[in-house]
Amino acid sequence: MMSWKFGKKFKEGGFLSGKHHSSNNNSPSDTSRSTTPTPGNPHPEDAVKPPVPRSGMLKIRVTAAKGLSLPQGVSVPAPVQEALTTHPTLASRIATSPPTAIVKAAGANRDSLQRRQVWWLPYLVLEFDKNEVLVDALGGDLASPVWMYSATFDVSRISEISATVYLRTREPHAEGREKSNGEGEGEDMGNSDLCLGSIRFTPNLDSLRVTDDWVTVQGGGGSGSINVQVSFKPASGQILTIDSFELLKVIGKGSFGKVMQVRKRDTLRIYALKTIRKAHIVSRSEVTHTLAERTVLAQVNCPFIVPLKFSFQSKEKLYLVLAFINGGELFHHLQREGKFNETRSRFYSAQLLLALEHLHSFNVIYRDLKPENILLDYAGNIALCDFGLCKLNMSNSDTTNTFCGTPEYLAPELLSGHGYTKCVDWWTLGVLLYEMLTGLPPFYDENTNEMYRKILTEPLRFPDGVRSEARSLLTGLLNRDPRQRLGVNGAQDIKNHPFFAKHINFTKLWNKQIQPPFKPAVASAIDTSNFDEEFTNEVPLDSVVDDSHLSQTVQQQFEGFSWSVSPLGESVGRY
């Protein structure tokens, strides 16, 4: 299967070019930058409960806030204070003009330009089930910004609504180049922006009434409330097809198909659409892996895993509709920077630990952890993708012998053919952490056979910059005996290691209450600047497939693949 970018191995690129990583030695604060909601129940211990299927459209309108304040001990940034002094009446004048918050065709650019005139007022990141919208203020003041913004989200399961308020510390560099949906390009979110607090709640999808509440802000400055109006419209049994989407950009390609950025025509939400040609996966005996990916994605209920929104099919193709995570692959950032500092490496590996723990709770082994399969969201949190190599129905005592994965990350028990368990994922977590800290996997060699020999026999060595706690953790994760490997008794043993225990509150991390140490440069929900131009410059087309004459028996293998927006959460089709 494929992630969102294919074919380029980092060992052939920037890691060997001598580029240095940018230092960032600040520990993450306990102030949430992310607004990604935890679907369903936000508590890790209850995460084995699959998401409750629901379908329809959720309209969220955020009007304004009141009583917001800066975090204790933080003063108004100088550029913001200067803007307030220079333009004392602009914000209030714009706020009193007729709101154009519901962005539609003719008024889209005017709405966006109005918002950009008052960049110094708090902006909002609104999110539902990993679909994110950045909303600049129309007017008001620092304590009481006015947004008057509405957005419609697709509902495929019960999830939380979250909204986080930030204050820029400087004016965005780029002039807003307007998009057709009213979202401008520019440096909208800065890594130094101040979090003023957030709200999180689960909407009542059993009621058809509009709720209108002032929700108390948590974190940040610790004061104030935000007015949110919510209404839900159940689905009417519509069947999804490729015509339900506007194709925007190609963001990845593979032998089985491609991944495109798309906009759903009715709600205008942005998604990643993965297309898979049936004939290719049938000819390569990959049907089981493909169906496993769909099964896992429909089950997961974790804030660090890309959720499946819908799936549907035609006679020739399968389609997976996923949340579009546009901060780029970890591969992209690691290749550019060479390596990460310990704080950043710890943050990513801790979130991955929670994602793998969640998969293991469903008796699923991931088996393909690597930087290419890890995405960064708007705010800098990770999102694990590409579940084509997952192995299902693996209890703690079960073993499997399938030889699969990426050479640099293969565990010794897999290479030796003795069978392996869930512990194989802890080995790959160790390899990834080592690579983030040093720039290369621990046993890397350009000759694959020599690399396999090193994985099986070479002593584990560390560069001088790797500190003692990290060395201890890596030694435990990279134990060649899976029966002695750290994590053999469960993820909690890894969480308890000083490398994590001294620095990470895993409950806060699960609830997105720890600010990521890095935020990718993302201008808007449709920004694809973090993806390879080799793909994004290609014209997005759902290419015609020659009639493959798949028999009815073969087509029956794909029954149950479709998962869409009918009242029962299923879009059923036979071909």
From Swiss-Prot:
Effect of residue 274 to A: Sensitive to fluconazole (cell wall stress inducer)
EC number: 2.7.11.1
Record-listed Phosphoserine modification sites: 543, 562
Region feature Disordered, mapped onto this chain: 1-53
Pfam family, one: Pkinase
Active site: 368 (proton acceptor)
Keywords: ATP-binding, Kinase, Nucleotide-binding, Phosphoprotein, Serine/threonine-protein kinase, Transferase
Annotated Protein kinase domain residues: 245-500
InterPro entries per the UniProt record, alphabetical: AGC-kinase_C, Kinase-like_dom_sf, Pkinase_C, Prot_kinase_dom, Protein_kinase_ATP_BS, Ser/Thr_kinase_AS
Gene ablation phenotype (knockout): Decreases virulence in a mouse systemic infection model. Sensitive to: high temperature; sirolimus; fluconazole; myriocin (phytosphingosine biosynthesis inhibitor); aureobasidin A (inositol-containing sphingolipid biosynthesis inhibitor); phytosphingosine. Abnormal sphingolipid metabolism.
PANTHER family attached to this UniProt entry: RIBOSOMAL PROTEIN S6 KINASE
Protein name: Serine/threonine-protein kinase YPK1
Organism this protein belongs to: Cryptococcus neoformans var. grubii serotype A (strain H99 / ATCC 208821 / CBS 10515 / FGSC 9487)
Highest taxon above the source species: Eukaryota
Domain AGC-kinase C-terminal: 502-573
Family: Belongs to the protein kinase superfamily. AGC Ser/Thr protein kinase family. RAC subfamily.
One function term, GO molecular function aspect: ATP binding
Gene name linked to the record: YPK1
